[in-house]
Amino acid sequence: MDLTNWWQGATQWFGRSSQKSLEQAFRSALKIKEIEDQYFQGKKIGPENCDYSADTVTYFANQIQRHLRKIEQEIYHLNSDQEFVKILSLDPAVKQDPQTEYVLNQLQFIDDILQRYDGELPQVSPPKQIANGGVLDLPAITANKQRQINKKRRDGFQYIRREDTQQKVDTATQKSGVLPRSFLRTIDRLKREMDPQSSDTEQKVLKQYRNSRYKTALSIKFVLTLIIVPLLAHQLTKTFFLLPSVESFFERNSEVVFINQSMETEAYEELSHFEESLRFRELLGFGEKLSPEAKEEKLAEKAKEISESYRRVSTNAIANIFADIFSLVAFSLVLVNSQREIEVLKEFIDEIVYGLSDSAKAFLIILFTDMFVGFHSPHGWEVILASIARHFGLPENQDFNFLFIATFPVILDTVFKYWIFRYLNSISPSAVATYRNMNE
């Protein structure tokens, strides 16, 4: 197999498995660069490069940290693809391919952003005081650990790096001067406010706000569409097409009442209970004494009522099976035709999740794990399985229920723990530490 064929196969593989991670990391790096250009004059995010308040700088620092974590996660996925590493170590002649050059340029841009914040991540909160008068600098510890992880991950692939002569980190001694920096920042702010071009900055802020509002509205609209469209498909197909067809079948076959033996047993028990209640009331003198013919007539009326009731249950169960199939088709069509909305929704969810504090993340993880795989979860699973069986008209099988409850929550718990160990530990180590402390 020659080098050209190998390169074509590797490129196709890369396009399927790694290009998505690279594109997401590149987009996050572009967002960091956009924030720097719009609000920090193209410099590193920090209070020394702007005249904003501490709360505003904290907001931007939170945004930068969220994008950096996203980049680190995607780079971790790239490093796990050995074929991707091989592509980057090909012969220089192969690297002249336009697609390869485009990939290398993206990696170069991402690496520049990571190097810029590798020395010191933006601090979003001051050190916390502890009881003995010491200082517990958790953000600095987390940043140190994260920098070590970043270095190990970037060692997985090598590519050409240019010298970053435009971005230089100034030390505190280099920044010091005759006038205080706060006074200089005030002068810069006044100059910027008096600048005739300051309206451009206002337009950029307004545009960013409109984009955020549009993203929120589109995400909520898409979620509602995912819920409403399948429900409408289910109800419309069931009411206007399926129920009339199934009812006509039962009318033509009047002897068919039950679709499983469990329904038949329940109907017999209900009729027996009615007969015993008649005899009980008769013995206590609560009603007139019925003749055998009258009692048989009442039992016949009750049997007819019970048969009609269970026939409706059987009709709905059969119609539900086909209606759910139509709902699944409608749901799939919405997903296939809404790729852009899916990307926006993913970004919206990422912003919400990354915006939560570590305590909130740990609380949600504990809530969901205890709800679905916790000590009291078997009772909830029993209710869910019984509801599904009634929905489709299936007989309730206790053996299957016990087997499901004994295996599925265990598998789900394993998946949760693997996700926490594999992904959450690399994205937010402090959230994992908080989760462990709260769980204990």
Curated annotation (Swiss-Prot):
Compartment(s) where it occurs, according to its Swiss-Prot or TrEMBL record: Cell inner membrane
Main location: membrane
TM segment ranges: 222-242, 316-336, 352-374, 400-420
InterPro entries linked to this entry: CemA
Membrane topology: Multi-pass membrane protein
Family of the protein in this entry: Belongs to the CemA family.
HAMAP family: CemA_PxcA
Name of the molecule in the record: Proton extrusion protein PxcA
Source species: Synechocystis sp. (strain ATCC 27184 / PCC 6803 / Kazusa)
